[in-house]
Each structure stands twice: as C-alpha cells, then as structure tokens.
Amino acid sequence: MSEFGFMGVDWEERIDFGRMRRERLQRARDAMAKAGADLLLIFSLEDVRYLTGFRSHLGPVALLGMAGAVLPRGGEPLLCTHDIVHARTRMPWIKPENVMDRPFIRTEGGTKKFADEVKAKVGKLAEGKIGVDIWTFGLSQWLPKCFPKAQFVDGREIINNAKMIKTQDEMECQLIANMITEAGFQALLDNLKPGVKECELLSIAWQKFTELGSEWSQCSNIVCSGPYAAPYRRFTSDRVIREGDMVIVDIGACFNGYWGDFTRTYVCGNILPTKEQIALHQESYNTLFNACGEAVVGKTNADIGKHLNDPKGNPNSDGLSGGHGAGVNPWEPPWVANLSPDAIIPLQEGMLFSIEPYAGKPGIGGFRLENQVFVGKEEPNIFTKLSFDERLVKDVHPLDKSTGRKRAYPK
C-alpha cells in the first residue's frame, strides 16, 4: 500500500474508484456463481454501496428500505433508492433505467410493489435461487408469496464471501481511513490533560475527522477514563479526567465507505504509571501483537483468536478481548473470538482484521488496545502506526515498529 494524498492527481497512480467498483461487482458475481444463486436482493446500506457505489443517507440506527440493490446473474445491478434524480445524475456507471424507487419492504403491499418491479427487470431469474441479506419475519411471509417459484438462500453469506478479500483500491481506502483516524487521535492527544471532559476530547477528534473528509464515525466512539476503564464501559461520558487516570480511546473515521478503527490507552498528565498498571498494559499489548503475528497465509482465524482471553497470556480480559473483519461494514467476517468449528477458515492474503484485546482490574486500571492488520504472505501488514504510551510499555514487541523509538520515560 502507498501512503499518498487523498486527491486525484495526474502525476501518480492513486485510488482508481472506477476499477474498485468494477472489481467489487465482479467479486459479488463470483460469490453468486459459487453459491449457485440467480438473484441477489441486498438491503444493508453498506452492501448496496459495495455493489453499486451508491452512498446513502445514514442514521444512528438501521432503517429498512432506505435503499436496496438487486444483482441478477449475468446482468447489471439495479439500484433502488429514494434519491432517484441524484443517482441518475451523478452515477453514470448505473444505467438510468436501472435506478428504481426505494424498496418499501416494511409492509406487505410495499414488498409486492418492489417484487413486481424486480420481476419486470429480471424475468425468469425470479423463479430461481434468490439470496436475501436481511430476512425479517415480515419478509419471510411476503417474499415467498411474491416469488412463488423461487428458492431462498442466505444472501448475507454470499455478499460477505465477496467482501472477505480486499482489492488493492479497497486496501488503499482502508489505509486512508486509518490515516484520518490517526490524525484525530493526535488532535485528541494534544488536548489530553487533567480537567478536560471525555466528551470534549471526542469532539476534538471528530472535528479533525470531518476536516479531513470523514463521512461518519465507526461507532459512537469511546473515550473512557479512570474507574470507567475497569470494569470497561464502552461509550463516552461527561466525566472530567484527572491526573493519573488511564484513558482508553477507541475511535475510527470513514473514508469513501471504509472504516478506520483502532484503540490506545494513555496515562493522563505528566505522571508515571504504577508497576501494576504497566503489567496490565503489557498483557494487553503482548496479546495484541501475538495475535497480529498470526495474520499470515497458512494460518486460520482460530490461530489469531487463541491469544484472546487466553487464561495464561490474557487472564485479566474479563472476556472482552475480541476481533473482527472490517471494510464497508466496520464489523464483518472473518471473526476471531469465540469461534464455533464451522467459523474457522484459512487466512488469505488481503483479509483484514481489527484485533482488540483488553486487560484490566478495578482500582488499578483498564487497558484496551487495537490494531488493524492485513493478512500477508510472509508477515502481517500492521498498518496502524500510532505508537503506544511509552510509559506503559516495558518490553517492545518485535512487530511494533513505532513504540520505543521516542521513549521519553524510564521503565
């Protein structure tokens, strides 16, 4: 991956968004072919974007029917949206006649209207194997009536399989999302001092995100300090941070639909941590890099997961150490923690993981750390570069390429 600017320029190759859309669509077609599907009905907004490049209006909770995408075997995608004129005007890669009204699938009548429009476009494919990514109780009753000759299968599994390995342009988007997140982190750190509220720090990070073009934040985002770090509380409050507090920061920016996501824990103020605090941070830190070290071809996601919540290596996790894939959805397969046997898969180059262990004890402190890492052929590609709090790292891990290079405090 290259660490270049965000703009399109004529003097070097950067992200080719047309190529990215074409390659994503081909991966979806390949996943459909592997599953033997004739038609794919997609209602998750992030996956509508994956198939069509349509950026939808977003809210704090999912709104079923905001947009949809239909992918017929051997055909071009259909985009279903409330923003018909916008899409037809600004998305020339989707034929105008393939932009349809939004899918009103919250009622039986709305579902029938949507189905009739789809059948008029795809013909006999509506009588084959149809993958659907969201299957509410209502849809489970209405769709079989609308497509009486069809066989329904899990469309979410199909689209997740398509997204599992990132293209080169997707990897570049992910890196830029991480770079924006790092910038937000730095702005936050520049203002981390006794007397500031958790929510004030988060607002500073969000402002930097927005200034650099972030579309959204990876979640409500977390600045968690003092007693809220152990037991761990995963949201931001109005607490005033005090000198010596451990401060967990878990934030992520969004670049063109791809989500940055990583976590660090810092000591507030010009003060050294205790030996107990250093030991807990080291537990989380070692677990993080030992798990990241497994992200190579030839391993499985279970090899990553075995380090998380391990009774010997990560005994103070409270069961909170975890990890997940990421892309156009900040939480998507492959998973790495609490795996059932059927969820264990071989790692392939280009898979992406967010790995986030925790270690903490009430009265001492809590320590959540997180990196994003791509699976590599020979070694993991850990592209989260923000260093850890030097005061909390006793022994620098060989895979940590930043911490220790600017150590300012004694062990």
Predicted regions and their residues:
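Active-site neighborhoods and metal-handling regions in enzymes and metal-associated proteins
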Residues: 1-411
